A protein has these predicted regions:
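Active-site groove signature of glycoside hydrolases
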Residues: 5-31
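Active-site mouth loops of central-metabolism enzymes
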Residues: 1-3
Length: 202
């Protein structure tokens, strides 16, 4: 814990960075019995240390352990990846869900983040991330095709909620390519319009 916090202070005070994103952040707040502790010393030190005033703290609020899914529970001072937003928007633009949840997601996902009087910026909205399907994959494939890496297509999630627009993979069909471009624009628009912080991956 001390090494992590000392490293963070160095990056803030010496390098001038303005925020951190914690991969599998729930791992950092487990106690010695591997239980999730939302009042963990790691979070308390960050909240109390003036070096971290006005520094953005962004959690990927889950890990692989028991009760690791902690979306909406990191509390004030933290923003969190909103995978409910990601999943819903992917489903919405595939036409598999209705509009009832759309207003909730576009208005900052208050069902997840309002419990501890958190602002809409607590929701980090995203469609794609550094792992899984890219935006182009989302509109080009119904299934993953990770066959060239020696893992026999076992790696990566099978729950991609994608739509190939009529043809699996690359195509020269102008109509399908036009539809794919429109679908990508739809996804990007719903990433830029809602309350909360957008996360855009290249």
């Amino acid at each position: 814990l001390a090494l992590v916090l000392d490293s963070m202070r160095y990056w803030v005070t010496e390098m001038g960075i303005d925020g951190f994103r914690f991969d599998l952040a729930t791992t950092l707040i487990r106690d010695s019995h591997h239980h999730v502790d939302q009042n963990h010393p790691f979070k308390r030190v960050i909240a109390d240390d003036p070096a971290f005033d006005d520094i953005k703290m962004i959690a990927e609020p889950w890990d692989m352990g028991p009760f690791g899914y902690q979306v909406g529970r990191f509390g004030r001072g933290w923003s969190e990846w909103n995978d409910r937003y990601r999943g819903f928007m992917r489903d919405y633009w595939r036409g598999t869900v209705g509009v009832q949840e759309l207003a909730t997601r576009l208005s900052g996902s208050a069902d997840l983040f309002d419990g501890s009087d958190r602002p809409p910026s607590a929701s980090i909205n995203f469609i794609t991330a550094h792992d899984g399907f890219t935006m182009r994959d989302l509109v080009s494939y119904n299934h993953k095709h990770n066959k060239a890496n020696g893992e026999h297509n076992r790696d990566g999630s099978d729950d991609n909620r994608s739509w190939n627009c009529g043809v699996e993979g690359e195509t020269d069909d102008e109509g399908i390519n036009a539809l794919r471009h429109r679908q990508a624009r739809n996804l990007i628009a719903t990433l830029l319009l809602p309350r909360g912080g957008p996360m855009i991956t290249a």
